[in-house]
Amino acid sequence: MLVTRFAPSPTGYLHIGGLRTALYNYLYARANGGKFLLRIEDTDLKRNSEEATQAIKEAFAWCKLDHDGEVTYQSRRFEIYKEYVAKLLAEGKAYKCYMSKEELDELRKEQEARKERPKYDNRYRDFTGTPPAGIEPVIRIKAPLSGEILIRDGIKGEVKFKVEDILDDFIIARSDGTPTYNFTVVVDDALMGVTHVIRGDDHLSNTPKQIVLYDALGFKRPEFFHVAMINGEDGKKLSKRHGATDVMEYKRMGYLPEALLNFLVRLGWSHGDDEIFSIEDMLKYFDPHDINKSSSTYNAQKLDWLNAHYIKTLPYERLADEMKEFGVDFRALPKGELLLNSLRERSKTLVEMSQSAKAIIDAPAAYDEKAYAKFITPSSLEILAKFAEILTLNLDAAGYEKITNEFLEQNGLKLKDLAQALRVALTGSSVSPSIFEVLEVLGSKEIKQRIQNILKERK
């Protein structure tokens, strides 16, 4: 069975690059009838954050990336790691190193002075003497001393590393007994049955060490896919200076999970010229072998465009549910569905939609200064006052359009003579959906009241 995993460290909030990695793993597993596992790599007890762990789970729930089985926590598996360290020691594949920090620092200085790559010199690899007093040893793996390590990567193809350039007898357990990152990753991936590892290419340099450990422990190597990083539009690695990076911040900014996942799947992968991908489409077409080798570029305008698409196309009930979190209960409004459907056509985010809705639902507490100065004049106020007099019944948008056109014709006016001033009176702004839909939503009594308010404001 194909098994993938996502394995974040809870030392910070989930980054959108991490969510893309999770999505790729999720899609590959689900499309092939496999399992998608979640592992929290929380062995750094000083830097771990319970808030960060919860944020990861919240992001998964928001995006509906359901994982199989229970979450695996590395901090609860130290005894398992100790067993495998002991196994390597017993088999002579690892050894205790008593080199002090001072000795390591001195060795590094000497190597740098000779312009050599700093690395451990294997002095305790075959040590049989009496250990020095007062030093708790670290445990090092016996790595190959020469040759090449070949990685057959599903994205990058064959990647070769010269042992002399990349490896030394690296540490697998610290002097306090805690295991190192590469060791825990290998043990857990093997015991969890992970067959395919899709991760960022910042992990590529770890892979030779992990391959050494897979082989030493007698575990089958998984297939690796190393995904190029996401860059900002300036070509530099994506960071906070390019905008939001925390996944849940996108929710707070009014982005839909469908839009964010669609956006992320396309950062490095494509299917023809298609831009819109539902989860069902992704499951049908996604293959990690098709991921681009080169870095992708974050494009905020593309995300806005996708979000606007999903706002326009989501079913009313679902969009109304989403909008409740932004303080607007469209179902509780007499003309809620009409208002939502009118606003969705011009909204890029749910925050924007919420602001537009509140501007219509609530009578203006203030008026946009520029719009007021431009459109609220003695003549426009006179027109508004006359228009209010014809409002006797609640009509639909077509009905309001009919009586408005009759009013304009009878008074020798054009729509522009009324519409913008009416928008300002009703919403406080010169920007709104169709003025006739706004009239239907508000009803004649509320329209007249808001016109009266602006007439009083001007006196």
UniProtKB/Swiss-Prot annotation:
UniProt-annotated binding residues for ATP: 240
Short motif ('KMSKS' region): ranges: 237-241
Encoding gene, per UniProt annotation: gltX2
Protein name as catalogued: Glutamate--tRNA ligase 2
Enzyme class: ligase
EC number: 6.1.1.17
Protein family: Belongs to the class-I aminoacyl-tRNA synthetase family. Glutamate--tRNA ligase type 1 subfamily.
GO molecular function: ATP binding; glutamate-tRNA ligase activity; tRNA binding; zinc ion binding
Biological process annotations from GO: glutamyl-tRNA aminoacylation
Motif 'HIGH' region: positions: 8-18
Keywords: Aminoacyl-tRNA synthetase, ATP-binding, Cytoplasm, Ligase, Nucleotide-binding, Protein biosynthesis
NCBIfam families named in the record: gltX_bact
UniProt catalytic activity: tRNA(Glu) + L-glutamate + ATP = L-glutamyl-tRNA(Glu) + AMP + diphosphate
Matching PROSITE patterns: AA_TRNA_LIGASE_I
InterPro entries recorded: aa-tRNA-synth_I_cd-bd (IPR045462), aa-tRNA-synth_I_codon-bd_sub2 (IPR020751), aa-tRNA-synth_I_CS (IPR001412), aa_tRNA-synth_I_cd-bd_sf (IPR008925), Glu-tRNA-ligase_bac/mito (IPR004527), Glu/Gln-tRNA-synth (IPR000924), Glu/Gln-tRNA-synth_Ib_cat-dom (IPR020058), GluQ/Sye (IPR049940)
Record bears the keyword Ligase: yes
PANTHER family (UniProt xref): GLUTAMATE--TRNA LIGASE, GLUTAMATE--TRNA LIGASE, MITOCHONDRIAL-RELATED
Annotated compartments: Cytoplasm
Functional note: Catalyzes the attachment of glutamate to tRNA(Glu) in a two-step reaction: glutamate is first activated by ATP to form Glu-AMP and then transferred to the acceptor end of tRNA(Glu).
Subunit and partners: Monomer.
Keyword NADP set for record: no
Gene Ontology cellular-component annotations: cytosol
